[in-house]
C-alpha cells in the first residue's frame, strides 16, 4: 500500500542514523546540517511473532512479514516555511508522506553539534511544529479564496470551505489541525502538514532511557501522540551484530525487552491505520496489509484483484483459536472456523482462506 512515514527532525537529531538502522542501509549520516537532501526511502519489515508460529503449524518453508515504508527527509530549521535552509524542498517532501515521525534529540554529546547551540527537546519540537503551522497557514490562506469562488457553482463543497476556515482559525491560534475536531476528509485535498498523524522518537543515551521521570515529561509534551524512546546509535550497533543471541544479551544489559526499531515499525504501521490478516500453507506463512475496516472482499483483492471480483466466501479462524487448537483440522472440529461473506469486516490476526470464482 502506498503509505509512507516521513522521518523529520532538526539537523543532527539522529534521523539518518535511525533510518540506517531501520533499513539496514548505509545512508550518509554526517555531523553537519543537511547531510540528507533528497529523501531516502526504505521498506521495513513489521515484526510479527505470529508468523513463526503459523509456519510451525503449517510447515511453511518461509515467512513473509508486512512492511511499512519510511522516508528520511532533510533536516528542517527555523524559517523553513520561508524557504530557509532546504525549507521548500523539505516541505514538498513531507507533504507527500502519510504520517510524520519526528526524531527529537535528548542525548548530549559535545562532539555532535546542535543547530541551536543547546539540547532542548521542547524547543526542538516547537520549532518544527511552528514551521509546519506556518506552512499550512500559507496553504489555507491561498485555498480559501479559490474555494469561495468554486462554491458559487458547486454547493457540494461548501463544507470544504467551512472546514478550511476552521483550519485557518486553528492555525492562527497555533493549533495543529489534527488536534481539532475538523473533519480531516474535508481538508484532505489541501495536504496540510499538521493534519497528518504524528509519532515522536526521542533519541536518548543509555542513562536517559532508564530515567522514567524524564520519559514521562517527554510523553506529556507530545500527548496524545505516540512517544518512543531509543538510542539510535545503539540500535544501529544492534543491527550490525547480525547475531540474535548477542543482540538479546545487549538489550538485557540495557534493561529493555526488544529493540526500539521493532516498536517503531509496529507503531508506524498502526499509525498509518493498517492491520494484517494472515495466510499459511506449505509454501509460506504471510501477513497481508489492509486498512483497518477493510471488508473480506477488499482483503482478498490485496492478494489479487480477481479474488475480489470473484469473491464467494472467506474461511476464517482467529490466530489465537488456531494456535490453541494446534491445527486447522482441530480448529474446525472445535467449531472455531467460520465462513464469512461480503459484508464481513476483517479483524487483525484473522487467518484466512478465500473462496472465489474466476
Give, region by region, the residue ranges found by the protein language model.
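C-terminal-of-GTPase-core extension/linker across diverse P-loop GTPases
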Residues: 2-8, 13, 19, 146-345, ...
